[in-house]
Structures are given as structure tokens and as C-alpha cells.
Amino acid sequence: MAETSNDPFLSYVLSSKQLTNLNRLRRKAVTKQLGSSDDNKVSEEFLRYQHTYQREAFEYLQTKHDAHKIMESQYEQYQSSSKTRRYSIDLDSVDAVDTESQTEYPNEEFIDRNEDSEAVMELRKRLLGKGQNKGLGYETTKSVDRQIEDQDTLQQDLIQDMSKLVGSLKQGAVAFQSALDEDKQVLGAAEIGIQVASQGLMDVSGKLRKYDKSKLSYLFYITVFIFMILGLVFTFIIIQLFPAL
């Protein structure tokens, strides 16, 4: 049987706890029923839950629902009573309360205003970064305008410096790209010269294979040597001419 209590909150908590325990028993019974080898046979715990705990679970659920409804109604009554209490004020007693408070604390409003003004001044000093300047009125406004102008000037200087830095970086990137292009041209010319020299060497080696070693004379070796030197000189001249172009 579900436990009853005059306190709806206590009934709600107890019913929730009992429902949690019954839910654990239900899961345990279902797990054993599913894990049993004989599917046609119903386990003892499952039967016990169906005959005993199922009715108790329904009673606890009903008790929990009733307690929740009671708490909702109590909360709505509290809200409505607080609203009516807020607006049900005796207008005749307002003047008396105000006059009494004014007579008892005549300097309270003045002290509050002084505290507010001091707090505002302290906050202004912190924001403006002032030292011990306590001037008010025109001097304070003038100093604030001067600081704003200084900040604007500083921002303009920073913008100009950043623009100059970006321009110099752009010029450096363009110069670096042009240098890379020149190096690419030089490497291309050197590659052409090397290909020409290698082609000449391949031609010479092919011709050498056609002749017999006995037919080669000193004049042929000298001619081959001169041809190799001329090929290297031609490659060097090509490398020197392309950067100038």
C-alpha cells in the first residue's frame, strides 16, 4: 500500500523513491525472464511482480500524481496571494510612514546622494586614469575631450604606420618575386647550355665509337679538347647574357 502523508512534498518524494525501487525490481524480473532457457515458463520473480508489485506501483504513481497536483495548486495560490498583497496597500498610511521616516532619518537622502556622487567620481578617475585631480565641471570635460583627441591622434598614427608597413611588405614581396623570375631565367639558360654541351658530347662519343683507336691521332684529341672548351665558354656566355636581358 502506498504511504500517505499530510505533506504533499513528502508524499511526492516517498512515492518517487518507491517507484524507483519498483522499477529496478521490474527490470530485474524482465531480465531474468528474457535470460531463462525455457521461454514458455514464466519466472517466479516476474509472477511476483505482476501479482504484488504492479498494484503497488500503480498506487504510488497515483499518489505522486495527486501530490504534484496539490503542490501546483498551492503554488498558484501563493502567486495570486502575493500579487494581491503587493497591490493592496493602505494609501492613508503612506504619508504617515513617509513623514515618520523623514523625521527619523533627515540626512539619509543627503548621505546617499553624496555616496553616489563619490562613487561616480571614483569610477570616472579609474576610467580616465587620473592621479589625484579632483576638479569638476569645465576642467573635467576639457580633460576628457583632450584625452579623446589624444586617443584619436594615436589611432591615426597607428593606422599610418600599419599602412606603411603593409606597403613595404608588398614592395619586398614584389622584389622577391622578380628575383625569383630572374633566377628562373638563369637556371633555364644554364639548363639549355648543359643540354647543348651534353648533346655535343654524345655526338663526339658516337663518332668516337665509329673510328678505330689506331686511326685516332693527336690532332683529333686536340680538336675534341678545343670543342669542349668552346662549348663551356658558350654556356658561360649564355649564363652571363640572360641576367642582363
Swiss-Prot record:
Molecular function in Gene Ontology: SNAP receptor activity
Role this protein plays: SNARE required for targeting and fusion of Golgi-derived retrograde transport vesicles with the ER.
Taxonomic placement: Eukaryota, Fungi, Dikarya, Ascomycota, Saccharomycotina
Keyword entries, A-Z: Endoplasmic reticulum, ER-Golgi transport, Membrane, Protein transport, Transmembrane, Transmembrane helix, Transport
General remark: Present with 937 molecules/cell in log phase SD medium.
Species whose genome carries this gene: Saccharomyces cerevisiae (strain ATCC 204508 / S288c)
CDD domains: SNARE_USE1
Topological domain spans for side Cytoplasmic: 1-218
Main subcellular location: endoplasmic reticulum
GO cellular component, one term: endoplasmic reticulum
Protein name: Protein transport protein USE1
Family affiliation: Belongs to the USE1 family.
Membrane topology: Single-pass type IV membrane protein
Compartments, as annotated in UniProt: Endoplasmic reticulum membrane
